[in-house]
């Protein structure tokens, strides 16, 4: 069963562009990871939201321990208002299967 993750990242205002650049540099490598079905960065005025979908909990676990995130850590050091808020979700299917879940 797929696993959905929503991560909220709040960059310090003076580092916003650098944080976005770090993510855009990392995203292609994550897209190539086994089990990555979606890894999409979104933004509003003060925060970034990463919406992820993984083929399984094992795929998510491998991602969280993988080289792409390990390499990204130093690029984000000192540039965030605090740790990312990461929420791991299971779908509650409802209505049309194509529209009722990620």
Indicate residue ranges for each PLM-predicted region.
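An amphipathic, aromatic/His-enriched active-site/gating alpha helix that lines ligand/cofactor pockets
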Residues: 25-37, 53-87
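Intrinsically disordered, low-complexity acidic/polar segments
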Residues: 16-18, 59, 95
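Short, well-ordered beta-strand segments in beta-rich or mixed alpha/beta enzyme
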Residues: 3-9, 40-64, 102
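Glycine-rich beta-strand-turn "strand-cap" elements at beta-sheet edges
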Residues: 2, 40-46, 74-102
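Short, surface-exposed ligand-recognition loops at beta-strand->loop->(often short) alpha-helix junctions
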Residues: 9-19
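Non-catalytic surface loops within mature trypsin-like serine protease
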Residues: 11-13, 56, 90
């Amino acid at each position: 069963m797929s696993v959905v993750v929503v991560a909220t990242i709040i960059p310090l205002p003076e580092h916003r562009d650098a944080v976005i650049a770090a993510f855009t540099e990392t995203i292609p490598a994550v897209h190539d990871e086994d089990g990555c079905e979606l890894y999409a960065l979104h933004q509003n005025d003060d925060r970034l939201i990463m919406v992820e979908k993984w083929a399984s909990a094992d795929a998510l676990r491998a991602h969280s321990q993988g080289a792409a995130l390990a390499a990204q850590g130093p690029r984000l050091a000192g540039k965030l208002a605090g740790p990312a808020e990461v929420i791991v979700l299971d779908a509650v299917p409802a209505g049309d299967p194509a529209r009722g879940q990620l």
